[in-house]
Design a protein with these regions (language model features):
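Hydrophobic (often cysteine-bearing) scaffold residues that line and stabilize catalytic clefts
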Residues: 6, 67, 71, 88
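Auxiliary, metal-adjacent structural segments of Zn-dependent hydrolase domains
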Residues: 1-55, 99-102
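Accessory DNA-engaging acidic/polar modules
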Residues: 110-274
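Active-site recognition of the HExxH zinc-binding catalytic motif
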Residues: 68-80
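Post-HExxH zinc-binding segment in Zn-dependent metallohydrolases
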Residues: 82-125
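Short pre-active-site segment immediately N-terminal to the catalytic Zn-binding motif
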Residues: 51-70, 84
Length: 274
């Protein structure tokens, strides 16, 4: 998804959780989101109240955990709009709980995304304040169940055709993307498949957030292992990188790809993004 599509979906969650008629003249949707294709050690996201800006990192994590982090930062923005400050008090977690319950009800994420998220203190603090997450009262909400995204990858040669059909380029996905109804999606796929290999066409439900991108795994000091690297999809000086064997990988494959390299002694590994 593009940053703008992610932003619009977050705004839909806010509209459901904090309807304008109950919160007139609010500025809850007046923020910017920047998805950083970068791994950080000490935090997954951050909010700058003076700029109304949210940054999200660590795209190697499970998608549902990234969504939970994104809603955490949206919670800080709403908290700041209400109180002119934000912290990790019970007041903040009341806002976060409300956002999470709304997003789960809409199908944007699942309750398992919260239960399995063990790389932050949110789950512990939410249950301390509000009891077992599995016992929360969550109502299903009607949200885009009948809409899909079509994503077209490796499609530079047909980009003009895609633009003419209303597709927008997502630099995060590195794909051309269009939203449409379920009745249109399969027919559209057949049209695009006339121009490009069908394996480069993906259809995904539009009622969730999918935050994904690509990393470039760069391996150097590895002369003794070049045969192994070549067999496993690495290219010498690939993708414009210099003096390294390079493999383009989905961001959420980073940990598993790094694990495969552990058996190669003395190599140097760098993770790059474009």
């Amino acid at each position: 998804m593009s940053s703008y599509t992610i932003y619009k979906t977050l705004c839909d969650v806010i509209d459901q959780a904090y309807p304008l008629e109950s919160y007139p003249d609010n500025k809850f949707k007046k923020f910017f989101i920047d998805i950083k294709v970068k791994e950080m050690q000490s935090f997954h996201g951050r909010y700058y109240p003076d700029k109304r800006k949210i940054e999200i990192f660590n795209l190697s994590r499970p998608n549902g955990h990234i969504i939970a982090t994104t809603l955490h930062e949206v919670g800080h923005h709403i908290d700041y709009c209400m109180r002119k400050k934000s912290d990790h008090s019970k007041t903040f977690y009341e806002i976060l709980k409300h956002l999470l319950i709304t997003a789960i009800g809409m199908g944007v994420m699942s309750i398992e995304d919260i239960l399995s998220k063990d790389d932050s203190a949110d789950k512990t603090r939410l249950e301390r304040h509000f009891g077992s997450i599995e016992e929360w009262d969550i109502s299903a909400l009607d949200y885009k169940q009948d809409f899909y995204f079509i994503k077209v990858y490796q499609s530079f040669s047909i980009k003009e055709k895609l633009k003419n059909r209303g597709y927008k380029y997502s630099s995060l996905d590195q794909a051309w993307v269009k939203e449409m109804s379920v009745s249109e999606a399969e027919e559209e796929k057949q049209v695009i498949a006339q121009w490009i290999d069908e394996k480069n066409i993906q259809i995904e439900q539009a009622n969730t957030i999918k935050i994904e991108s690509y990393y470039y795994l760069c391996v150097s000091n590895c002369y003794d292992h070049k045969a192994y690297l070549k067999e496993n999809g690495f290219m010498w000086n690939g993708y414009g990188m210099k003096k390294a064997w390079v493999k383009k990988i989905p961001s959420q494959s980073l940990k598993s790809e790094e694990a495969k390299l552990l058996k190669l002694p003395n190599i140097k590994v760098k993770v790059a993004a474009k």
